[in-house]
Amino acid sequence: GYDFENDRDFTSVEQFASELNDWLSTRGYRNLYAVYGCSMGGSIALMVTLEQRIKINHCIMDGGITPYQLPWFVTRFIALKDYLMMMLGRVGGISLLEKAFATDEYSKEDLQYVVDVLRHCSRKTLWRTFDSCNNYRVPEPVSDINTQIHYWCAKNEEKERKQDIAYMKRKFPQTEFTKLPDLG
């Protein structure tokens, strides 16, 4: 969905994690020191870990997104809002991104890359990104894992990640939390 050299649509966090585990397994990986993911990548890292097809010592979620704990119809409205914002960014280009988001820490080249990615992605990929990332299914009950989970969060995004942190504390009490200095 996001790869300029592959026009496949993104499907879901769960499927991407499963395909990543397949890829690693077919190449002979049986043990990884760590998996790392930022934001949506944190969701994928967690799901790769929870499948337990490969022994993983550390799962690092850097501001990782956890499933919403809201009624299904509410999550649809949130996904729709996020999707429409991305579609506006896709149509409006850099000038709209600069107006809609805090872009002080990004160069024109960075912003152009974001626009290029948004324009490359299909509408289906963009919708599925928000729908899946906010609603992926963590196994219930969570089976015991021998992986140390780490949740990193920048000090200035702590409020934004409050629900994710609470979810991780509730579902994965063994998680080690690290507050990073003012970043991201």
Model-inferred region functions:
Residues 35-37, 62:
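Short beta-strand immediately N-terminal to the catalytic nucleophile in serine-hydrolase-like folds
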Residues 1-34:
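Active-site loop/oxyanion-hole signature of alpha/beta-hydrolase fold enzymes
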Residues 70-72, 90-143:
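Conserved alpha/beta-hydrolase catalytic His-Asp/Glu region
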Residues 145, 151-153:
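Short beta-strand/loop motif that positions the catalytic acidic residue
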Residues 50, 56-86:
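Flexible "cap/lid" loop of the alpha/beta hydrolase fold
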Residues 37-41, 45:
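Gly/Ala-rich beta-loop-alpha elbow adjacent to hydrolase catalytic centers
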Residues 165, 169-184:
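Catalytic histidine neighborhood in serine/cysteine hydrolases
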Residues 158-164:
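Conserved alpha/beta-hydrolase "acid-adjacent" motif
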